[in-house]
Amino acid sequence: MMAFPPQSCVHVLPPKSIQMWEPNHNTMHGSSQSPRNYRVHDSQQMVWVLTGNTLTAVPASNNVKPVILSLIACRDTEFQDVKKGNLVFLGIKNRNLCFCCVEMEGKPTLQLKEVDIMNLYKERKAQKAFLFYHGIEGSTSVFQSVLYPGWFIATSSIERQTIILTHQRGKLVNTNFYIESEK
Protein backbone atom coordinates (compact mmCIF):
# COMPACT_ATOMS: atom_id res chain seq x y z
CA MET A 1 0.00 0.00 0.00
CA MET A 2 1.35 3.41 -0.93
CA ALA A 3 1.65 5.86 1.96
CA PHE A 4 0.18 9.32 1.53
CA PRO A 5 2.88 11.95 2.12
CA PRO A 6 1.44 14.90 4.06
CA GLN A 7 1.52 18.09 2.02
CA SER A 8 0.67 20.31 4.96
CA CYS A 9 -0.62 19.99 8.49
CA VAL A 10 -3.29 21.66 10.56
CA HIS A 11 -1.94 23.06 13.82
CA VAL A 12 -3.53 25.30 16.42
CA LEU A 13 -1.65 28.55 16.88
CA PRO A 14 -2.11 31.15 19.65
CA PRO A 15 -4.37 34.12 18.88
CA LYS A 16 -3.07 37.39 17.46
CA SER A 17 -4.64 40.68 18.35
CA ILE A 18 -7.28 41.61 15.81
CA GLN A 19 -8.23 45.17 14.99
CA MET A 20 -11.98 45.42 15.25
CA TRP A 21 -14.45 47.97 14.02
CA GLU A 22 -17.75 48.94 15.49
CA PRO A 23 -20.78 48.83 13.20
CA ASN A 24 -22.66 52.09 12.73
CA HIS A 25 -25.95 52.88 11.03
CA ASN A 26 -24.27 52.65 7.59
CA THR A 27 -22.75 49.21 8.19
CA MET A 28 -25.47 47.36 10.09
CA HIS A 29 -26.59 45.38 7.02
CA GLY A 30 -24.95 42.20 8.23
CA SER A 31 -24.16 42.75 11.89
CA SER A 32 -26.75 40.29 13.17
CA GLN A 33 -25.50 37.49 10.90
CA SER A 34 -24.29 34.30 12.55
CA PRO A 35 -22.35 31.35 11.13
CA ARG A 36 -24.14 28.44 9.51
CA ASN A 37 -23.10 25.02 10.72
CA TYR A 38 -22.53 21.92 8.61
CA ARG A 39 -21.61 18.27 8.95
CA VAL A 40 -18.88 17.41 6.43
CA HIS A 41 -17.84 14.17 4.74
CA ASP A 42 -16.07 13.19 1.54
CA SER A 43 -16.97 10.60 -1.10
CA GLN A 44 -15.36 7.86 1.01
CA GLN A 45 -17.51 8.75 4.05
CA MET A 46 -14.54 10.26 5.89
CA VAL A 47 -15.47 12.91 8.47
CA TRP A 48 -13.31 15.58 10.08
CA VAL A 49 -12.23 15.13 13.71
CA LEU A 50 -10.08 17.21 15.99
CA THR A 51 -7.41 15.07 17.62
CA GLY A 52 -5.45 17.24 20.01
CA ASN A 53 -4.49 20.22 17.86
CA THR A 54 -4.73 18.38 14.55
CA LEU A 55 -7.67 18.09 12.17
CA THR A 56 -7.79 14.65 10.56
CA ALA A 57 -10.18 12.62 8.42
CA VAL A 58 -11.51 9.30 9.72
CA PRO A 59 -14.25 6.90 8.59
CA ALA A 60 -17.68 7.91 9.86
CA SER A 61 -19.08 5.63 12.57
CA ASN A 62 -21.19 5.74 15.73
CA ASN A 63 -17.97 5.88 17.77
CA VAL A 64 -16.70 9.02 16.03
CA LYS A 65 -17.72 12.56 16.97
CA PRO A 66 -16.93 14.69 13.92
CA VAL A 67 -16.38 18.43 14.13
CA ILE A 68 -19.11 20.68 12.83
CA LEU A 69 -17.92 23.22 10.27
CA SER A 70 -18.98 26.82 10.87
CA LEU A 71 -19.16 28.95 7.76
CA ILE A 72 -19.92 32.66 7.45
CA ALA A 73 -19.80 34.93 4.42
CA CYS A 74 -17.17 37.66 4.24
CA ARG A 75 -18.55 41.20 4.00
CA ASP A 76 -15.37 42.65 2.48
CA THR A 77 -15.71 42.24 -1.30
CA GLU A 78 -12.11 43.12 -2.24
CA PHE A 79 -11.21 39.52 -3.11
CA GLN A 80 -14.59 38.53 -4.57
CA ASP A 81 -14.47 36.28 -7.64
CA VAL A 82 -17.90 34.86 -8.48
CA LYS A 83 -16.36 32.29 -10.86
CA LYS A 84 -14.54 30.69 -7.91
CA GLY A 85 -17.39 30.84 -5.40
CA ASN A 86 -18.55 32.81 -2.38
CA LEU A 87 -16.02 34.38 -0.02
CA VAL A 88 -16.27 32.69 3.38
CA PHE A 89 -14.53 32.21 6.70
CA LEU A 90 -14.37 28.65 8.04
CA GLY A 91 -14.21 27.59 11.67
CA ILE A 92 -15.04 24.78 14.06
CA LYS A 93 -18.38 25.09 15.88
CA ASN A 94 -18.16 25.80 19.63
CA ARG A 95 -14.41 26.36 19.39
CA ASN A 96 -12.50 29.56 18.75
CA LEU A 97 -10.66 27.83 15.91
CA CYS A 98 -10.64 29.12 12.34
CA PHE A 99 -9.02 27.77 9.18
CA CYS A 100 -6.02 29.79 8.04
CA CYS A 101 -3.53 29.44 5.17
CA VAL A 102 0.15 30.18 5.75
CA GLU A 103 3.41 29.35 4.03
CA MET A 104 5.64 26.85 5.82
CA GLU A 105 8.88 25.60 4.33
CA GLY A 106 7.96 27.23 1.03
CA LYS A 107 4.59 25.47 0.76
CA PRO A 108 1.00 26.64 1.39
CA THR A 109 -0.19 25.03 4.61
CA LEU A 110 -3.58 24.77 6.29
CA GLN A 111 -3.67 25.64 9.99
CA LEU A 112 -6.22 26.22 12.72
CA LYS A 113 -5.77 29.49 14.58
CA GLU A 114 -7.37 30.50 17.85
CA VAL A 115 -9.72 33.18 16.56
CA ASP A 116 -13.46 33.67 17.00
CA ILE A 117 -15.09 33.44 13.56
CA MET A 118 -17.35 36.39 14.43
CA ASN A 119 -14.31 38.58 15.07
CA LEU A 120 -13.13 37.82 11.52
CA TYR A 121 -16.61 38.58 10.20
CA LYS A 122 -16.73 41.96 11.99
CA GLU A 123 -13.37 43.20 10.68
CA ARG A 124 -13.61 46.07 8.23
CA LYS A 125 -10.82 44.63 6.04
CA ALA A 126 -10.74 40.85 5.75
CA GLN A 127 -7.51 38.99 6.44
CA LYS A 128 -6.78 37.13 3.21
CA ALA A 129 -5.16 34.18 5.03
CA PHE A 130 -8.54 33.29 6.62
CA LEU A 131 -10.58 33.55 3.41
CA PHE A 132 -11.76 30.71 1.19
CA TYR A 133 -13.82 30.53 -1.96
CA HIS A 134 -16.73 28.17 -1.31
CA GLY A 135 -17.50 26.69 -4.71
CA ILE A 136 -20.22 24.24 -5.69
CA GLU A 137 -19.40 21.37 -8.05
CA GLY A 138 -22.46 19.23 -8.67
CA SER A 139 -23.74 18.22 -5.23
CA THR A 140 -20.40 18.86 -3.52
CA SER A 141 -18.57 21.83 -2.04
CA VAL A 142 -14.95 22.83 -2.59
CA PHE A 143 -12.92 25.26 -0.50
CA GLN A 144 -10.14 27.10 -2.32
CA SER A 145 -7.65 29.32 -0.51
CA VAL A 146 -7.91 32.99 -1.44
CA LEU A 147 -4.30 33.59 -0.38
CA TYR A 148 -3.05 30.65 -2.48
CA PRO A 149 -5.22 30.40 -5.63
CA GLY A 150 -5.48 26.86 -6.95
CA TRP A 151 -4.88 25.32 -3.49
CA PHE A 152 -7.85 23.46 -2.00
CA ILE A 153 -8.73 21.92 1.36
CA ALA A 154 -8.30 18.16 0.93
CA THR A 155 -8.52 14.81 2.69
CA SER A 156 -6.44 11.76 1.91
CA SER A 157 -8.03 8.55 0.70
CA ILE A 158 -6.09 6.93 3.56
CA GLU A 159 -7.80 7.28 6.96
CA ARG A 160 -6.35 9.20 9.90
CA GLN A 161 -4.37 11.58 7.70
CA THR A 162 -4.20 15.30 8.40
CA ILE A 163 -6.50 17.58 6.44
CA ILE A 164 -4.30 19.58 4.07
CA LEU A 165 -4.11 22.13 1.29
CA THR A 166 -3.33 20.68 -2.13
CA HIS A 167 -3.03 21.89 -5.70
CA GLN A 168 -3.24 18.31 -7.07
CA ARG A 169 -6.97 17.77 -7.32
CA GLY A 170 -8.14 14.22 -7.92
CA LYS A 171 -4.77 12.59 -7.28
CA LEU A 172 -4.86 10.54 -4.08
CA VAL A 173 -6.84 13.27 -2.33
CA ASN A 174 -10.46 14.38 -2.05
CA THR A 175 -11.17 18.08 -2.54
CA ASN A 176 -14.93 17.74 -2.94
CA PHE A 177 -17.04 17.51 0.20
CA TYR A 178 -20.66 16.87 1.01
CA ILE A 179 -21.95 19.38 3.54
CA GLU A 180 -25.25 18.94 5.36
CA SER A 181 -26.83 21.75 7.32
CA GLU A 182 -26.93 21.13 11.05
CA LYS A 183 -30.10 22.35 12.70
UniProtKB/Swiss-Prot annotation:
Which UniProt keywords are listed? Answer: Cytokine, Cytoplasm, Immunity, Inflammatory response, Innate immunity, Secreted
* Compartments in which it is found: Cytoplasm; Secreted
Q: Does the keyword Cytoplasm apply?
A: yes
Q: Which residues form the propeptide?
A: 1-30
Q: What InterPro entries does the entry give?
A: IL-1_CS (IPR020877), IL-1_fam (IPR000975), IL1/FGF (IPR008996)
Against SMART domains, the record matches this protein to: IL1
Name the domain of life: Eukaryota
Any one GO CC term of the record: cytoplasm
What's a Pfam family this protein contains? Answer: IL1
Which molecular function GO terms apply here? cytokine activity
On subunit structure and binding partners, the annotation says:
Interacts with cargo receptor TMED10; the interaction mediates the translocation from the cytoplasm into the ERGIC (endoplasmic reticulum-Golgi intermediate compartment) and thereby secretion.
What is the documented function of this protein?
A: Cytokine that binds to and signals through the IL1RL2/IL-36R receptor which in turn activates NF-kappa-B and MAPK signaling pathways in target cells linked to a pro-inflammatory response. Part of the IL-36 signaling system that is thought to be present in epithelial barriers and to take part in local inflammatory response; similar to the IL-1 system with which it shares the coreceptor IL1RAP. Stimulates production of interleukin-6 and interleukin-8 in synovial fibrobasts, articular chondrocytes and mature adipocytes.
User: Which family, according to the similarity comment?
Assistant: Belongs to the IL-1 family.
What is this protein's name? Answer: Interleukin-36 beta
Gene source species:
Mus musculus
Encoding gene per record? Il36b
